[in-house]
Amino acid sequence: HPDEVEAMKEADMEELSHMAKEDKVVAIGEIGLDYFRKEGNAYKGIQKEWFCRQLDLAKEIEKPVIIHSRDAAEDTIQILRDFRKKNPQIENPGVIHCYSYSPELAKEYVAMGFYIGIGGVVTFKNAKKLVETVAQIPLERILVETDSPYLCPEPNRGKRNDSSQIRYVIDRIADIRGIAPEEVEKQTEMNARKM
């Protein structure tokens, strides 16, 4: 997680590389950038450095990535643009976890091959951009998420989140798109298996 990179050492990267090669590992993440809690160019530089190295590890072991990006839209998209430009052969780069940016940015991520992770926030009253995003991107590029234990959907907002809450996310996506919840469930399950 980006919040933890300040303490990372080279030995940690070596251990991560070793663990990532285990058969049970299906993706590398959460990796990315988080400028919400700490400010400053030095801290941003450290995050960017480790993010790029973790992307390279995922490429090396041929695993998708789970991207965390909070208050770091421009830096995240630029790093991923550069990564995809150098690695166009990667068919399934990963998911932008707990997506919270604009529909336009989501479309660019989708064009790069990423899935867009939609969680409990889509049920919140103030989630206008996310609702627009869900309406505008292909259902074939959406994954449903919990972000457990955080961001529990309405009507249970503020409580501990878990996988039993995913139904509310599916129902909201179906409502936004004007389709049956079963269609959302079927397609997003196929998406998750494909990723």
Indicate residue ranges for each PLM-predicted region.
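Mid-to-C-terminal alpha-helical segments outside catalytic/metal-binding sites
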Residues: L57, S164-M195
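Conserved, mostly hydrophobic/aromatic
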Residues: I28-E30, A58, Y109, V134, ...
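Short acidic/histidine-rich active-site segments
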Residues: E140-D162, V184
